[in-house]
């Protein structure tokens, strides 16, 4: 008798069958260039599985199973939610509830991410009436199995209740609110392919609005209706296809629903599209640029379509227009409208005129859909002849020189791609990412952010933000020179080579072609060449050294250049990331500006006179504090000239008041106060010096979540360390006054211990740093005078990094004289001034450099 093989239970067989079908589709998703057919196939396979479960659960024919949302549209990405509605007749037996629960449970067991609702027709209509999300999901409802009559009754009731105008207003408001969550820009470093501005949700929103209004449910139907042109329909289909493919591949690569194009997945996603790294660009940068261009096109076309749909749903009650440029432009309901569809073909110089009128005409709040469409379809007109036309060059300069509206005009020029077609080198950096770990914007967005920051200096209502910058720009003649420099300072990023030198050549050519001559042209070119110099001097060099100030003053040469460079530098740093700027950096730059201005005004950078001035100012402050007249001498007699040059009068007075009674203290004295220059804590440490002191202090800060911004280390003549630190708390909303006493007590107790230095904590790197690690660099060299050694360190930022460096130095008994801690987002560029004793030995230098590289390695 032959043995029979037992058949697997139906549920197991069905699960294996569906799993195999889905796996086969997922494999095809990995390489398919057009995923819409696969999305439909996955939807059909899911339909079949749900029908089978429905029948197995014995659900009666009086019910209906309805697909809603994206599933209703028949489009499923590999790991999308499967949204279903179980539609009930008005009267139904309560025992159905158990069967429905079993059906939904079995669907989950099948591996489907089910989103379910169980409602009658009345309940659906009621829910949709006060929840636009429910109303939207039901718009694309599709029957899978069950009662056709019930489903048709539901759809009839739904359509009768749907108010197209109210739906339009709700969806446009919803879209604006969604865009606001992403700062109204598609240029996020980790965009959400579905939800970000210019993403799939924008395209879906337009089709939902059009469908609700009865205008059609596809790009072809909207084309037929006259809402878009053939060319626009092709562009929409092409970009929609790319975004769908990108989202599907993200799902497959992540093995789950993943709509955010996170750093960790960007390289794999890029490789799935065939991008390969080049000497100039990573594969991920090439993919991201394509994404940004697609999102930008979607944003442009969505704006046109929404305005067109709005015009049909809400016909204008008044046709009153105002002529702005005869035969070219009128103002209609607050929008700039072309007088005829072929204005730009007949008058190419009207293209830039549109932005000048938008900028300069009160009451004009934007460009109409008709104007935007004409711009979009006039790309062929924007050719070399158009760029060389003297009329366009004059208009471009007029746009730059208007008293207001410049930022809005340039942003709109970029959104409509006109700016990149006029400045071809600008077009090259549109959508270009910057993986330098501190820029959080693409190059084009960063440039426009810098332009915006300079403009804000000149706007009275923003004068409270940076009062010193606002004060300077008020008296700065022809500020448009700064705007030109802002446009060109990073325009050569990503070409390979020195972007400052390459950008200089671009700026020089622009000036020549646009009639900018003499000192103005020279200033623009010089600013582009040296736009990084002031921040490097302020943050990496010892600005208490008169030689440093004198050398910088010689480079600058004039007060106008100094002011221009200062304003551009502040705007540039502010335009990299909200995290990079802080008030401490602002103070360093302002101090450098004032010291350089004094030299340019004829003051000689003389250490002796500066020493005398600082001491006199400090004594005046001490008298206000009722410190006895000669009480300061005991401390000051132990301090060298360097101490007085590195600290301002207010700090000298504070430290003297704290220490004049304790010059020969037996125990550590620690005092802390909120920093006078910004949101930070200033910590004073006075204790008998030892080789591991700096490392021990850094260890305490590291363990307590305090980041060091600046360290000024001094050794008195009688062997005491007088160290000053500016630190910030990594947690937000900390009240430094509240933690000052705690820091004083804990740090003093830590310094009283004789325990060995603890092992550095290997803090966790951010995802950005893990994905785009920078090559750590260590440079150790003698300074120009041979008095100290300068240690420069560049690495990914992480908790414990400064202490790791300090510990290596302590182990080799290398003293730290000063430290400039420069944190740029996820990157640090620190500079230390070290005691030269012993470092003249080349073997020790090499050993220290080697161990430092090991300590800072990712």
From Swiss-Prot:
Entry EC no(s)? 2.7.7.59, 3.1.4.-
Region Uridylyl-removing: list its residue ranges: 325-681
Q: Does the keyword Hydrolase apply?
A: yes
Reaction(s) this enzyme catalyzes, per UniProt: [protein-PII]-L-tyrosine + UTP = [protein-PII]-uridylyl-L-tyrosine + diphosphate; [protein-PII]-uridylyl-L-tyrosine + H2O = [protein-PII]-L-tyrosine + UMP + H(+)
Q: How is its activity regulated?
A: Uridylyltransferase (UTase) activity is inhibited by glutamine, while glutamine activates uridylyl-removing (UR) activity.
Against Pfam families, the record matches this protein to:
GlnD_UR_UTase (PF08335), HD (PF01966), NTP_transf_2 (PF01909)
Recorded hits in InterPro entries, A to Z, give: ACT-like_dom_sf, ACT_dom, HD/PDEase_dom, HD_domain, NT_sf, PII_UdlTrfase/GS_AdlTrfase, Polymerase_NTP_transf_dom, UTase/UR
Positions of the UniProt region annotated as Uridylyltransferase: 1-324
All copies of the HD domain together span: 443-565
What protein name applies here? Answer: Bifunctional uridylyltransferase/uridylyl-removing enzyme
The organism named in the record is Burkholderia pseudomallei (strain 1106a)
- Top-down, what is the taxonomic lineage of the species of origin? Bacteria, Pseudomonadati, Pseudomonadota, Betaproteobacteria, Burkholderiales
Q: Which gene encodes it?
A: glnD
């Amino acid at each position: 008798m032959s043995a029979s093989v037992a058949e697997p239970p139906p549920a197991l067989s069905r699960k294996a069958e569906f799993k195999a079908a889905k796996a086969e589709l997922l494999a095809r998703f990995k390489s398919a260039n057009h995923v819409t057919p696969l999305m439909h196939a996955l939807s059909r396979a899911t339909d079949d599985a749900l029908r089978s479960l429905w029948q197995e659960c014995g659900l009666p024919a009086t019910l209906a199973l309805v697909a809603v949302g994206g599933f209703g549209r028949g489009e499923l990405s590999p790991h999308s939610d499967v949204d279903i509605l179980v539609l009930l007749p008005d009267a139904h037996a309560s025992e159905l509830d158990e069967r429905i629960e079993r059906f939904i449970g079995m669907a989950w067991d099948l591996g489907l991410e089910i989103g379910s609702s169980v409602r009658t027709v009345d309940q659906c209509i009621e829910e949709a009436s006060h929840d636009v999300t429910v109303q939207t999901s039901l718009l694309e409802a599709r029957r899978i199995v069950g009662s056709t009559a019930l489903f048709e009754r539901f759809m009839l009731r739904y359509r009768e209740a749907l108010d197209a105008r109210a739906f339009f207003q709700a969806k446009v408001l919803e879209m604006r609110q969604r865009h606001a969550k992403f700062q109204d820009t598609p240029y996020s470093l980790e965009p959400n392919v579905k939800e970000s501005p210019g993403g799939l949700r924008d395209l879906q929103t337009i089709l939902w609005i059009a469908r609700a209004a009865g205008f059609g449910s596809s790009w072809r139907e909207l084309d037929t209706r006259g809402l878009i042109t053939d060319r626009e329909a092709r562009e929409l289909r092409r970009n929609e296809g790319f975004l769908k493919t990108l989202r599907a591949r993200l799902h497959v690569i992540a093995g789950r629903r993943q709509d955010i194009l996170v750093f960790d997945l960007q390289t794999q996603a890029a490789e799935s599209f065939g991008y390969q790294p080049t000497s100039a660009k990573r594969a991920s940068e090439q993919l991201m640029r394509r994404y940004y261009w697609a999102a930008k096109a979607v944003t442009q076309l969505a704006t046109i379509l929404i305005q067109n749909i709005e015009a049909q749903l809400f016909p204008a009650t008044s046709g009153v227009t105002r002529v702005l440029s005869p035969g070219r432009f009128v103002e209609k309901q607050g929008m700039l409208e072309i007088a005829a569809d072929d204005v730009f073909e007949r008058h190419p110089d009207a293209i830039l005129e549109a932005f000048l009128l938008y900028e300069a005409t009160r009451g004009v709040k934007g460009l109409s859909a008709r104007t935007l469409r004409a711009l979009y379809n006039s790309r062929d007109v924007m050719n070399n002849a158009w760029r060389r036309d003297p009329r366009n060059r004059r208009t471009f300069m007029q746009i730059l020189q208007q008293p207001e509206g410049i930022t809005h005009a340039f942003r709109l020029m970029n959104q409509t791609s006109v700016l990149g077609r006029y400045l071809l080198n600008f077009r090259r950096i549109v959508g270009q990412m910057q993986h330098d770990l501190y820029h959080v914007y693409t190059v084009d967005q960063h440039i426009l952010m810098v332009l915006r920051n300079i403009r804000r200096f000149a706007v009275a209502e923003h004068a409270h933000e940076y009062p010193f910058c606002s004060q300077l720009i008020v008296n700065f003649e022809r500020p448009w020179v700064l705007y030109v420099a802002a446009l060109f300072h990073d325009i050569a990023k990503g070409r390979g080579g020195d972007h400052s030198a390459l950008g200089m050549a671009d700026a020089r050519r622009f000036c020549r072609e646009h009639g900018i001559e003499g000192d103005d042209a020279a200033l623009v070119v010089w600013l582009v060449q040296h736009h990084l110099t002031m921040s490097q001097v302020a943050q990496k060099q010892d600005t208490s050294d008169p030689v440093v100030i004198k050398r910088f003053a010689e480079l600058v040469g004039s007060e106008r250049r100094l002011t221009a460079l200062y304003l551009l530098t502040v705007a540039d740093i502010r335009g990299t990331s909200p995290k990079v700027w802080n008030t401490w950096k602002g103070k360093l730059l302002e101090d450098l500006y004032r010291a350089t201005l004094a030299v340019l005004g004829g003051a000689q950078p003389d250490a002796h006179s500066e020493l005398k001035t600082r001491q006199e100012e400090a004594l005046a402050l001490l008298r206000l504090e009722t410190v006895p007249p000669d009480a300061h001498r005991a401390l000051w007699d132990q301090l060298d000239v360097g101490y007085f040059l590195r600290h301002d009068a207010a700090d000298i007075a504070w430290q003297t008041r704290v220490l004049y009674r304790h010059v020969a203290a037996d125990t550590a004295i620690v005092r802390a106060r909120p920093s006078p220059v910004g949101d930070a804590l200033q910590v004073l440490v006075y204790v008998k010096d030892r080789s591991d002191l700096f490392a021990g202090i850094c260890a305490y800060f590291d363990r307590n979540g305090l980041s060091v911004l600046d360290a000024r280390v001094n050794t008195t003549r009688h062997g005491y360390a007088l160290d000053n630190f500016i630190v910030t708390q990594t947690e937000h909303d900390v009240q430094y006054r509240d933690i000052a006493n705690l820091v004083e007590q804990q740090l003093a107790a830590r310094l009283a211990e004789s325990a060995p230095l603890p092992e550095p904590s290997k803090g966790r790197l951010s995802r950005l740093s893990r994905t785009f690690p920078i090559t750590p660099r260590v440079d150790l060299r003698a300074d120009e005078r041979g008095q100290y050694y300068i240690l420069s360190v560049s690495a990914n930022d992480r908790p414990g990094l400064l202490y790791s460096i300090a510990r290596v130095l302590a182990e080799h008994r290398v003293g730290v004289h000063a430290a400039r801690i420069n944190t740029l987002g996820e990157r640090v560029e620190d500079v230390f001034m070290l005691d030269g004793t012993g470092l003249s030995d080349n073997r020790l230098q090499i050993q220290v450099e080697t161990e430092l590289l090991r300590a800072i390695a990712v």
